[in-house]
Each structure stands twice: as C-alpha cells, then as structure tokens.
Amino acid sequence: DLGAEWKKLTGKKMVYALWVANKNFASEQPEMLQLVYDRIRHAFTQGLQHKKAAIESVIKDKPFTYAQLDEYLGPTIRWNLTDDYIDGLKTFYELAHKMNLIEHIPEIKLAAVKR
C-alpha cells in the first residue's frame, strides 16, 4: 500500500487527491468558487449517505467484497484535509523538489469558503 510505505518513509500522512483552483480564479470569482465548493461538499455528503447503494451497484463488476469496499470508502479514505495531511503534502513537494522532479515547491494556500 502506497500510504503505508509513505508513512514508513516519512512518518507522515499521505494525500492521494485534492480539489484545486487557480488562485486568480479564486480571487476573481469568489462566488463561483463557493458554488463549486458547495457542490463538491454536497456530492461527498450524498456519496457517504448512499454508500451502501453505491457499493451494491458496482460490487458484481469488482474483485472486492462488500466489506472491503465499505472499509475503503469508510474509514480508510479520509475526506478532509487536516494540518497533518497538509504537512505530509508539503513533505511530498519538498522531496520531489530535492529529486528534481518539480522545479519549485508549490505554495499551499487554502481558499476562503463558507463551510
């Protein structure tokens, strides 16, 4: 598991995916940014509320058990970005920069949205 290997290497949490917005878009169109945020949050909420139905709709086509998918979509995947995860992401960028995989370390700046 990639996350377990990352934890062994760095002692930090791993971020697998993010929703990102261009900072010009975020500053020039805050209402649209809020709308996108609200829709994404709603989709996550709906997905978690209907997790059983979602699993049942795909289980016949997957090589996993119901319990495995339930665990994966439940406590295994974290749906929030805490300071611990941001710290892990910064470490990822720092290591990628040291290995010349990226030219510069990106700034992580969270957009202002109503939660």
Where is each model-derived feature located?
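An extracytoplasmic/periplasmic, membrane-proximal ligand-sensing/linker region
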Residues: 57-115
